[in-house]
Amino acid sequence: MAPTSTFPVINMELLAGEERPAAMEQLDDACENWGFFEILNHGISTELMDEVEKMTKDHYKRVREQRFLEFASKTLKEGCDDVNKAEKLDWESTFFVRHLPESNIADIPDLDDDYRRLMKRFAAELETLAERLLDLLCENLGLEKGYLTKAFRGPAGAPTFGTKVSSYPPCPRPDLVEGLRAHTDAGGIILLFQDDRVGGLQLLKDGEWVDVPPMRHSIVVNLGDQLEVITNGRYKSVIHRVVAQTDGNRMSIASFYNPGSDAVISPAPALVKEEEAVVAYPKFVFEDYMKLYVRHKFEAKEPRFEAFKSMETETSNRIAIA
């Protein structure tokens, strides 16, 4: 296991003072070489975060725990009987809330009204933070302010934004199942509010698994496949996983600020060098990418990119012949 001491942690307060150039350089390095970083003093109140954590854990205990225990008992039995089946399971209890383009939080069963209102407040704060971070990335990339948020909005004028709320309960057989299998994220920029007492999130760097350190009131940020494409590979999405733990119930609230379903994604022209003879990344509609991703989430991302490059080539050839 590689040490966590070098994992990038960025104090966003420094962006407002004399240390801004150094903080921006640290952010750029994290995006280029890690694809993950942790931010402190990000503008979301600690009181709101504490309330979200309390109500999320209470909701799991009250509504989801018994269901998961029943699922877990069946899962472990089947996994012991069929190891191949166990390798395709994740030891997590989740529900998903969509915020944009239209919220579905009123339709999620078993959420009390206070929790719904709280999650809407939290989502609004995260949306603002995501767009702020995207503008900081634009600054480092030499793109005009708002380029990334505009690219994400697409013709319909709205990104896709949603939150996956997960619990990773204690697992008696972490040798048998993962908390969440290794993958890259399909979308844009991901903001994670994770448990500060129970770890398990790891990223793959230089062939080694690196722990993402739990830190109180921090937000973990990682970059998805779409930012890799738009930045023409300058920034990369990174393989990560959640390791099942024998002790503790890990909370994870991951909010995905993604392109709208109709957004056309391609490398930013300003980041494509004229001398590049071979196109590194394809052009595609985000919804089409997601259709491919859901079938191949736990596989390497490169074949997904290549599949769309092949489609582009075939289309160009048909046009040329016509």
From Swiss-Prot:
The gene is ACO1. This is 1-aminocyclopropane-1-carboxylate oxidase 1. PROSITE patterns: FE2OG_OXY (PS51471). One of its GO terms (biological process) is fruit ripening. Gene3D superfamilies: B-lactam Antibiotic, Isopenicillin N Synthase, Chain (2.60.120.330). Its EC number is 1.14.17.4. Pathway: Alkene biosynthesis; ethylene biosynthesis via S-adenosyl-L-methionine; ethylene from S-adenosyl-L-methionine: step 2/2. It is an enzyme of class 1 (oxidoreductase). Its cofactor is Fe cation. It comes from Oryza sativa subsp. japonica. Pfam families: 2OG-FeII_Oxy (PF03171), DIOX_N (PF14226). Residues 159-259 form the Fe2OG dioxygenase domain. Belongs to the iron/ascorbate-dependent oxidoreductase family. Keywords: Ethylene biosynthesis, Fruit ripening, Iron, Metal-binding, Oxidoreductase, Vitamin C. Transmembrane segments: none annotated.
